[in-house]
């Protein structure tokens, strides 16, 4: 398939790890994060990539890093391959548009999730308990309802499998009171600002996941920010309370895999071309809407 980067191999550069989507290298005092076109579903990486997906994720992150830089510093050093240290400029053709040279921060062991609407695992929790992550919500809310106020619902990072939702009290035990309060405050501020920007463009940010780390003793924003892989974006025009919403993400892929009754165990099946093209179009569409 044209223009699909499933994996990078940068000779002479130390590969630290391959995540579900990103290849992470170490160079001098920095990390190089390369977003490939890999796509995962149900925690399994699929053999088929989505053209340009890595570039779109990177460009959306850069857009949001710039928009919230008044709230918190981030890990970006440069996204211009010509400015990367040697021998990286030689790989410009692969790296351009899909990579970031970043500060080597120490990641917090907690993922910071903010929910403004009731959806996904939050909706499931609410149906069972009337709460999300130990936060009591008003009675009688329906699926996709806007919450009275956005809520901070952290989770622990799982190396394998699903992340586990935790309460704020548990977050304090893991991070300490000061850091826990700070990431909560920063996460909510970022979400509120981004939600206002997106809404003006006809997009609802239902929920999103962010990551923070320490760099030289200072808390900074790391990883990706407000992308279709880390957030649920809905169309404001098509929003209907009480129902599941269409998201600008890989839902088309998940729906297809459910329809063929795949057992969710590796190896995953190949995706047909029409599913790949439709998914690529969803990613391109949200990029165009947000950055226009």
From Swiss-Prot:
Enzyme kind, highest EC tier: ligase
Gene Ontology process terms (BP): 'de novo' IMP biosynthetic process
InterPro entries xrefs: SAICAR_synt/ADE2_N, SAICAR_synth, SAICAR_synthetase_CS
Pfam families: SAICAR_synt
Keyword Cell membrane: no
Pathway(s) this gene product operates in, as recorded in its UniProt entry: Purine metabolism; IMP biosynthesis via de novo pathway; 5-amino-1-(5-phospho-D-ribosyl)imidazole-4-carboxamide from 5-amino-1-(5-phospho-D-ribosyl)imidazole-4-carboxylate: step 1/2
Superkingdom classification of source: Bacteria
Transmembrane segments: none
EC number from the UniProt entry: 6.3.2.6
Keyword annotations of the record: ATP-binding, Ligase, Nucleotide-binding, Purine biosynthesis
Reactions catalysed: 5-amino-1-(5-phospho-D-ribosyl)imidazole-4-carboxylate + L-aspartate + ATP = (2S)-2-[5-amino-1-(5-phospho-beta-D-ribosyl)imidazole-4-carboxamido]succinate + ADP + phosphate + 2 H(+)
Molecular function as annotated in GO: ATP binding; phosphoribosylaminoimidazolesuccinocarboxamide synthase activity
PANTHER family given in the database record: PHOSPHORIBOSYLAMINOIMIDAZOLE-SUCCINOCARBOXAMIDE SYNTHASE
Family stated for the protein in its record: Belongs to the SAICAR synthetase family.
Name of the molecule in the record: Phosphoribosylaminoimidazole-succinocarboxamide synthase
Organism listed in the record: Thermodesulfovibrio yellowstonii (strain ATCC 51303 / DSM 11347 / YP87)
